[in-house]
Each structure stands twice: as C-alpha cells, then as structure tokens.
Amino acid sequence: MSEKYHSTVTRRDFMKRLGLAGAGAGALGAAVLAENNLPHEFKDVDDLLSAGKALEGDHANKVNNHPWWVTTRDHEDPTCNIDWSLIKRYSGWNNQGAYFLPEDYLSPTYTGRRHTIVDSKLEIELQGKKYRDSAFIKSGIDWMKENIDPDYDPGELGYGDRREDALIYAATNGSHNCWENPLYGRYEGSRPYLSMRTMNGINGLHEFGHADIKTTNYPKWEGTPEENLLIMRTAARYFGASSVGAIKITDNVKKIFYAKVQPFCLGPWYTITNMAEYIEYPVPVDNYAIPIVFEDIPADQGHYSYKRFGGDDKIAVPNALDNIFTYTIMLPEKRFKYAHSIPMDPCSCIAYPLFTEVEARIQQFIAGLGYNSMGGGVEAWGPGSAFGNLSGLGEQSRVSSIIEPRYGSNTKGSLRMLTDLPLAPTKPIDAGIREFCKTCGICAEHCPTQAISHEGPRYDSPHWDCVSGYEGWHLDYHKCINCTICEAVCPFFTMSNNSWVHNLVKSTVATTPVFNGFFKNMEGAFGYGPRYSPSRDEWWASENPIRGASVDIF
C-alpha cells in the first residue's frame, strides 16, 4: 500500500497537504533554527530533511543516534508525568497479571474473575480441556474468524497448521530461560525443564575449557562512564539488542522495583501448576514470591534464596550495583503480516528466548570487564516500561509499553540489568509519541478483548495489578491475550524504514502535534502498518531477512 502512496503523491504535494510547504519556524521552532543558522522557510521536504540532518544528535541521546526531532528531558521526568510522592513499591506485577491473585480467586464462589490467561491455565491443567478450547486461545481464534478469514483453521493447538505448531514450539523454547531438559528421565531427580541462569550470573553459555574470566588476575577495564556506555552499546547490539540506555539507582528509582517477586517465574499459573517444581535451577526456586532487599554487601554477593533450601527468603541486591543497563530486542517485522497463530504468534514470542541469550552474553561481557551484574530477564525487578521510559528508550504509549522513535512498536523488552560498571545515565526523551497516542487510539479500536483504554491518560490505575502515580495509560492485563494486533496496527510500527515520508511524519508528530489527527486518519487510508494476509503459504515461501528483522533500519 505504501508503494502506491509514494507513487501518486509527490513530496511537494504532500507538504502542501500538510500545510508545511513554505513553512519553517512553525514546524521546527524558530529558536532551534536560528541557533543552528538554518533557514526559516523550507521549499520542500528535502529542505526540511536536510535541516534535520544538520540538527542530528543535538537534541537526543546520542548513544541511540536519535534523529534531530527527538528531544531530551530531565532525569526522572519522562513525558508521562510522574508524581514520585505517589509511587510506592508493590508486589507481583508481570505482563499478564499479578503474582498475587485475590485470596479467594480460586474459590468457585468468586465472582470477579476476569483473568483469561490464568483461567485458561486452570482449564487446561486442572479441567483437562484442549488447549484450543480454553478461553485464552479461543478468544484469538474467534477474532481471526470474524476479522481475517471466516474459514480460519486453528489446528489441533489453536495456532494453525502443523507448520505453525512447529514454529511456535521452537520459537518459545527457552522463554524465561526454561529449556527442555534433554537428560530428563536419565538420572534420578531430573526435571522436564532446565535453567542455566541465576540472578547474579550465568552458569552456562560458555566455551568448555575456557577459564572463568573473573578468576583471572589481570586488572579490570577502566573507562569513563561515557566510554563504558558506548562499549556496552556496541557489545549489546553485537549480541542482538537494539536500543540501549542507562539509569542511576536513586531513591526514586528504587520505588519502581517490585516489593516482591518470584525469581524467573512469569505468571500466577506458575504457582497454580507448581511450575517451579518442573525446572532445574542452579539455585532452587520455590512457589512463592520473596522480597527484593537492597543491602550493603559486596558487589559480587547478590543472590536469591528460599528457606526450604536453607536460604533466607529474599533477593539480596548489593547497593554497590548502582547502575541499571537497559535494552530492547527488535522483533521480526515481516512475520506480523502473517500472524495467523493468534494468540502468542512466533513474531512476538521469539523475543523471549532471545532475551535469555542476549542477557547471558551481556552479563558475561560485564564479567569479562571485571565487574558484577544481576540479571533476571523480562520479568525481573519491576515493570519494564518504567525502566525503558526513564532511560530514554522510548515513550509510554496507549498500550502501556514503550514506543521507540527509531524502531516504533516493533521491539520488546525494556530489559534491565543491575551492575557496578560505571555508566553515564541517559535521559528520558520526547518524540511526540505520547501526544500522538492521545489522538490516535487505533490500537484500542482493534483490540479483540478491549484490554486497551479508549480514555485519556490518568494518574490512578483502574486495575488492582497496575501501579498508580504516573499520568499514563493502564493496560487491563487480565484481558490481554498476547495477540500482537496492537503492535501491528500501530502507525509507528513500520515508520522505521528511513523512507522520506516516514521520517517526515515522525518529525512532524514530534514538532507539530496539530497534525496528529491527520496522520491517524492517513494510517487508516493508506495503511502504513502490516495488514494480515489470509494466505498461509506466502510467508513460508518467502525469503525472510535474518532473524526476520528488516536490515534497512539499522
């Protein structure tokens, strides 16, 4: 669709329709133009983009090479206004609900049940239903039949034909560092799943015979915080990350850490189904959450432990680990157009085992520099969007997760790693994304279960498992079915390909929000984002980019 649009509307005509032809100061700001000795009037879009190149980096976190129209704000002051006096640590957030369900949630007399994923796990594990007949999967199947293909065949598991089943089976293996144990049943006490990760290091993923680099006696790396951030960016992107950032742990930042978590376990169903009993961890995990405690202990002594295994029921975080390194993982953009495996399509869930791999390599890289770190994956420490927002990876969106100016909604993670490696903190950004979300709402219109708010941002959360105290949107995680539709229909999804029109749209969104309604309508008319294809075979016959990610946006 975008090709047709590009071929029938000239740059000059497009500028006229925007009211930007012959414009300058109104679009970019007279002060910025004057400060950089740039003209106050632009004849066409090329003039506008040339001016942007001249401003490149002046108003952005240079570590991510944000374009000129991305500005930075003060530390701890993102575009979703925060009243830090209202922010309190709370227990058990994760991206599908809470670790702590209401006490009577499992009672047959409970009337407020709406957590479709937990209920589906109960249906599958305890009631013996087929996976595709559970509420979680069935809601996605119904949406596909009503909106995409009336003859949609969900297959045996609800994801599609046998190829789709095989793809999601392979794509999800390793999620949250839970791999199928190839030695299960071959020795006494073996468990079906295997984890190599602890919260203060990686026990696996190294070359056999290579000495533990932390045991060597040569001096550790010494660099400035700015140099360290740049080498971390280079290493993280080499391992598979996209954007990166850093935050200093202050008293305010500590407020966004969970009060309690269950290490490495994502979701209340892990407790309901005793999932921790099926996983071999280097340090055992029990079936309940334990508090995160900041302590004055050596930087290499961070740990978690449970009383049942001789520990002290806490996650101990050394105060010496006073920096947070944040990063995201880019998703396979092309696959979204063919996301027939709703919910939990491989285009989204492939990110979770990648989190494990990238985190492992980053932790070992930090160890190789002579420093310490504590990871924990996507479910660790606190809500990812908060860390991503504060470190300038992106802005909070209507769907609650962040949208990045460079990669749009096509990332996952806002992953966070604690370390004593000195890092220069990156600032929150303003790319006009939050303001655009106020007038857009396409994601809410298309959400199959209406988990996304149609209202404006608010300080108080209407849901018991979301934190209050920031002026933003609060996703109803109880209704979310992991369908990826909100990501695919977002106008920012494919605005990352460096075409002139996408850069113009994004720069105008950032500098002239009066056009936001126009761009929202233009998305509906021209369809920037991918649209679902009813053809099952087209994606399988296509030549995909490496790891499915477009290479032209790097």
UniProtKB/Swiss-Prot annotation:
Signal peptide span per the entry? 1-42
Q: Spell out the subcellular localization from the entry.
A: Cell membrane
What would you give as a GO molecular function for this chain, any one?
4 iron, 4 sulfur cluster binding
Per UniProt, residues of the 4Fe-4S ferredoxin-type domain are 425-457, 471-500
Annotated control of activity? Loses 93% of its activity upon incubation with 1-iodopropane and titanium(III) citrate in the dark. Subsequent exposure to light restores 80% of the original activity. Completely inhibited by 2 mM sodium sulfite or sodium dithionite, and by 1 mM cuprous chloride.
Q: Which Pfam families match?
A: Dehalogenase, Fer4_7
The record ties this protein, via InterPro entries, to: 4Fe4S_Fe-S-bd, 4Fe4S_Fe_S_CS, RDH, RDH_dom, TAT_signal, TAT_signal_bac_arc
What is the name of the gene encoding this protein?
A: tceA
Q: What is this protein called?
A: Trichloroethene reductive dehalogenase
Q: How is the cofactor bound?
A: Binds 2 [4Fe-4S] clusters.
Q: Which family does it belong to?
A: Belongs to the PceA family.
Q: Does the keyword Nucleotidyltransferase apply?
A: no
PANTHER family per UniProt: IRON-SULFUR CLUSTER-BINDING PROTEIN, IRON-SULFUR CLUSTER-BINDING PROTEIN-RELATED
Concerning PTM, the database record says:
Predicted to be exported by the Tat system. The position of the signal peptide cleavage has been experimentally proven.
**Could you tell me what reaction this enzyme catalyses?**
trichloroethene + AH2 = (Z)-1,2-dichloroethene + chloride + A + H(+); (Z)-1,2-dichloroethene + AH2 = chloroethene + chloride + A + H(+); 1,1-dichloroethene + AH2 = chloroethene + chloride + A + H(+)
GO CC annotations? plasma membrane
Q: What EC number(s) does its UniProt record assign?
A: 1.21.99.-
PROSITE patterns from the xrefs?
A: 4FE4S_FER_1, 4FE4S_FER_2, TAT
Q: What does this protein do?
A: Catalyzes the reductive dechlorination of trichloroethene (TCE) to cis-1,2-dichloroethene (DCE) and of cis-1,2-dichloroethene to chloroethene. The substrate specificity is broad, and the enzyme can dehalogenate various substrates, including 1,1-dichloroethene (1,1-DCE), 1,2-dichloroethane and 1,2-dibromoethane. A variety of other haloalkanes and haloalkenes containing three to five carbon atoms are dehalogenated at lower rates. Trans-1,2-dichloroethene (trans-DCE) and chloroethene are degraded at rates which are approximately 2 orders of magnitude lower.
Which cofactor(s) are needed, names only? [4Fe-4S] cluster; corrinoid
Q: Where does [4Fe-4S] cluster 2 bind?
A: C447, C480, C483, C486
Q: Which topology term describes how it sits in the membrane?
A: Peripheral membrane protein
| Binding, [4Fe-4S] cluster 1 | C437, C440, C443, C490
Principal EC category: oxidoreductase
Tell me the organism: Dehalococcoides mccartyi (strain ATCC BAA-2266 / KCTC 15142 / 195) (Dehalococcoides ethenogenes (strain 195))
Q: Which UniProt keywords apply?
A: 4Fe-4S, Cell membrane, Iron, Iron-sulfur, Membrane, Metal-binding, Oxidoreductase, Repeat, Signal
